Amino acid sequence: MGSVLGLCSVASWIPCLCGSAPCLLCRCCPSGNNSTVTRLIYALFLLVGVCVACVMLIPGMEEQLNKIPGFCENEKGVVPCNILVGYKAVYRLCFGLAMFYLLLSLLMIKVKSSSDPRAAVHNGFWFFKFATAVAIIIGAFFIPEGTFTTVWFYVGMAGAFCFILIQLVLLIDFAHSWNESWVEKMEEGNSRCWYAALLSATALNYLLSLVAVVLFFVYYTHPASCAENKAFISVNMLLCIGASVMSILPKIQESQPRSGLLQSSVITVYTMYLTWSAMTNEPETNCNPSLLSIIGFNTTRPIPKDGQSVQWWHPQGIIGLVLFLLCVFYSSIRTSNNSQVNKLTLTSDESTLIEDGNGRSDGSLDDGDGIHRAVDNERDGVTYSYSFFHFMLFLASLYIMMTLTNWYRYEPSREMKSQWTAVWVKISSSWIGLVLYVWTLVAPLVLTNRDFD
């Protein structure tokens, strides 16, 4: 009897696996918009992929991965292939994820509303999409080595560079929303309390940035060497100071009264993180001490024969993963009314979203029977670009690939080590990010004939 009931329970989920996104979460989540629930499920798809990729790097997994035909055949290098098989597995898994999201991105080009037949694919058929993703990933493991890893390294680097810029755009959006929320509460009442909170958050961000700069000069520079690190730290520090001063200039404040030091402090902290992340990828070990070696720990796995050690745990990678998760889930639930950021992320503003509880039509949030529903808030027009959202997840897959492998370039005939290319990608992204932030400040002054409200 219990087996029959269990089978019936499983069978009740079959329509959900082929139906829309809200059906999957309606039993365990509160009511919400269809557009938000769909993005959350795609983000969970990516999170599962990240977890599996992390498992691939666990010491001891190489014995299982070596069973895949052709994975380590006829490869001789400084580092034995069986030690680096986890890195190769991450490349193939992320390749499969990236191709899955790129396929969806191309399929969803110019979808304008949920009445488009392609929108049903975006918002439903979850079992088939999951099966497709798994099939692509499994197929990727049988791709001959050849130049695959080398070519995909450069593709991953370009994609990760773009995703870092998207992270910064979302960070700017978050900083603007944070500042606007606290300023509104400060104006409504209890102004001293909220003013103190605003001042404390800003001061904390700048204090963290100052401490980071001091530590960078202490541990990542030497009096007679590490000229590149000295230049990176100094230039980014001066650029952050310049952006902070610019944010409080009278002309900027006149055109954007809500701009201020809180946003600048958040951008400054992120810029310092990118600076540190870039320096940790330098090939010269004397200018690139690992964080754990600084505090007296070691996480390298020694290789029994002649060869180099392989570090399995990278602090900068952990921080990168945390920022990645925050970015992806924030992009899934955000309903920003910042018009400049919305134009960059191809998202409609908050006013286009159907408010919860408006009407009791076929797509109402609650049918009165206590069952959670989700409103179809995209019948008249999508609230975000389906194609761009999937393209962002495509870039996110590449960013994860580069982060988990610490931006190493793998070649069987050479050592597994950092590349200057990775350093310049991260440093240039920090500069472009600062330029984007400054542009959000000066755009209303430069383009006077456009409305930025």
UniProtKB/Swiss-Prot annotation:
InterPro entries: TDE1/TMS
Top-level taxon in the UniProt lineage: Eukaryota
PTM-bearing positions, type Phosphoserine: 351, 361, 364
Subcellular location: Endoplasmic reticulum membrane
Pfam families: Serinc
Residue intervals passing through the bilayer: 40-60, 89-109, 124-144, 152-172, 198-218, 232-252, 260-280, 310-330, 388-408, 427-447
Protein's name in the database: Serine incorporator 1
Native species: Mus musculus
Designated gene of the protein: Serinc1
